[in-house]
């Protein structure tokens, strides 16, 4: 399923990970178990009639959890290339998983 807006995607993540905390950006104090961090990786611009518009935005998702296996199939399906194990983080005492997602159109950037 393609998500055209950041808010749509975040709402879906919140529904599927209802007992997790989800952050856009984070500080070290936010490192707790069952947490998903969303970080901006890149954005592409296109031009329509000489006017720049946001074509797409790519985000990195970082998941912290107790288990060494990420088994939420619905969340895996929401990513560009699946969810990958990155290792164990002794500071947070969590297993770390990463993924990327690309959202399309001007709504791919969150409203501030």
Predicted regions and their residues:
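Oligomerization/assembly interface segments of phage tail-like spikes and tubes
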Residues: 54-67, 95-108
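Short proline/glycine- and acidic-rich turn/helix-capping motifs at secondary-structure junctions
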Residues: 28-31, 90-102
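Small/polar-rich, solvent-exposed N-terminal microdomains that initiate assembly or binding
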Residues: 1-46, 51, 66
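Compositionally biased, intrinsically disordered linkers/stalks adjacent to structured regions
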Residues: 9, 13, 17-20, 99-112
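Low-complexity, intrinsically disordered Gly/Pro/Thr-rich segments
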Residues: 80-91
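Short, conserved charged micro-motifs
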Residues: 68-75
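Intrinsically disordered, low-complexity acidic/polar segments
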Residues: 47, 70, 108-112
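Short intrinsically disordered coil segments
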Residues: 52-56, 76-79
């Amino acid at each position: 399923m393609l998500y055209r807006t950041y808010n749509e995607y975040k709402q879906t993540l919140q529904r599927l990970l209802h007992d997790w905390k989800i952050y856009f950006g984070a500080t070290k104090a936010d490192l707790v178990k069952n947490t998903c961090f969303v970080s901006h990786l890149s954005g592409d611009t296109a031009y329509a009639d000489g006017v720049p518009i946001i074509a797409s935005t790519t985000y990195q998702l970082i998941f912290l959890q107790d288990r060494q296996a990420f088994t939420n199939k619905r969340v895996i399906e929401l990513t560009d290339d699946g969810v990958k194990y990155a290792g164990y983080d002794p500071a947070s005492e969590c297993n770390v998983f990463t993924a990327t997602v690309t959202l399309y159109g001007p709504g791919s950037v969150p409203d501030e």
